[in-house]
């Protein structure tokens, strides 16, 4: 649970701000072992270009290099064509597997926008 957003919250760069141009892109694995309770995930997506949409979701795995599956409740709203979107979702880390990644699927052409996902989390022993 996020008790103190000031001094007790840590930022998780699930997907650092990066160009989302074609296909499906996946972020690096984030280890949730040191965190507990709700994690707020914030999506910041800029307009991607005419007809371009971004479908962003969180995926999870028991091992860093394992097979990743969708996190229950971990999908953001798909952006409208050529529209920016900022959105926040909450997922409880106790309900997720140890490792998470972000997945961005670009549809409708070659994107020209940037997409980032940041998590705000509380450590177990802080």
PLM region spans:
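C-terminal interaction-tip segments
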Residues: 1-13, 106-126
């Amino acid at each position: 649970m996020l008790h103190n957003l000031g001094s007790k919250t840590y930022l998780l760069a699930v997907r650092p701000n990066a160009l989302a141009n074609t296909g499906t892109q996946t972020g690096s694995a984030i280890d949730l072992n040191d965190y507990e309770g709700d994690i707020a995930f914030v999506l910041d997506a800029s307009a991607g270009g005419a007809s371009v949409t971004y479908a962003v979701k969180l995926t999870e795995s028991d091992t860093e290099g394992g097979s990743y599956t969708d996190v229950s409740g971990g999908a953001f709203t798909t952006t409208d064509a050529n529209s920016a979107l900022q959105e926040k979702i909450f997922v409880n880390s106790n309900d997720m597997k140890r490792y998470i990644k972000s997945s961005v699927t670009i549809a409708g052409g070659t994107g020209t926008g940037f997409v980032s996902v940041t998590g705000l989390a509380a450590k177990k022993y802080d």
